[in-house]
């Protein structure tokens, strides 16, 4: 009886040892992927225009976009996506929101929830998502 228990214990210890080695190998492979700066820096630029009753300022617009994302998905997704209004043309009511590759869909989903700025009803309409700032600026007529 003791010899059978000893064999079972040895098999379990070997099994746990094998699982630990496989887990540590997988973890070290994932760390190498995260260190790739091209993946970390991947940006997305959302080209949008604003339909509003009166003119809207860029600073107010960024605050409303961040608040709508926070209301929809919470602080965690706000920190992940980190949306910023890079460029905003007040004359044509067009602009560019910068975000990362992970959070751009969350930002797109939260744009309809931005409904009001300083008592002024607004609607933010995304036109296109691009991977380069140069192309985004070209879409709104800059450079």
Swiss-Prot record:
Cellular component, GO, one term: cytoplasm
Q: Which GO terms describe its molecular function?
A: ribonuclease P activity
Q: Which Pfam families match?
A: RNase_P_Rpp14
Q: Where is it predominantly found? A: cytoplasm
Q: Which reaction does it catalyse?
A: Endonucleolytic cleavage of RNA, removing 5'-extranucleotides from tRNA precursor
Keywords of the record: Cytoplasm, Endonuclease, Hydrolase, Nuclease, tRNA processing
Matching entries from Gene3D superfamilies are given as: Ribonuclease P, Pop5 subunit
HAMAP family recorded: RNase_P_2
Q: What does this protein do?
A: Part of ribonuclease P, a protein complex that generates mature tRNA molecules by cleaving their 5'-ends.
Family indicated by similarity: Belongs to the eukaryotic/archaeal RNase P protein component 2 family.
Q: How does it assemble?
A: Consists of a catalytic RNA component and at least 4-5 protein subunits.
Kindly provide the name given to this protein in its UniProt entry: Ribonuclease P protein component 2
- The encoding gene is rnp2
């Amino acid at each position: 009886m003791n010899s059978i228990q000893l064999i079972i214990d040895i098999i379990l210890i070997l099994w746990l040892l094998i699982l630990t080695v496989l887990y540590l190998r997988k973890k070290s492979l994932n760390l190498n992927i995260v260190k790739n700066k091209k993946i970390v820096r991947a940006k997305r630029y959302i080209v949008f225009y604003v339909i509003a009753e009166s003119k809207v300022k860029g600073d107010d617009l960024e605050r409303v976009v961040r608040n709508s994302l926070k209301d929809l998905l919470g602080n965690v997704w706000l920190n992940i996506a980190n949306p910023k209004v890079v460029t905003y043309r007040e004359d044509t009511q067009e602009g560019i929101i910068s975000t990362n590759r992970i959070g751009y869909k969350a930002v797109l989903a939260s744009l309809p929830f931005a409904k009001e700025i300083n008592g002024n009803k607004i609607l933010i309409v995304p036109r296109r998502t691009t991977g380069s700032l140069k192309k985004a600026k070209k879409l709104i007529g800059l450079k």
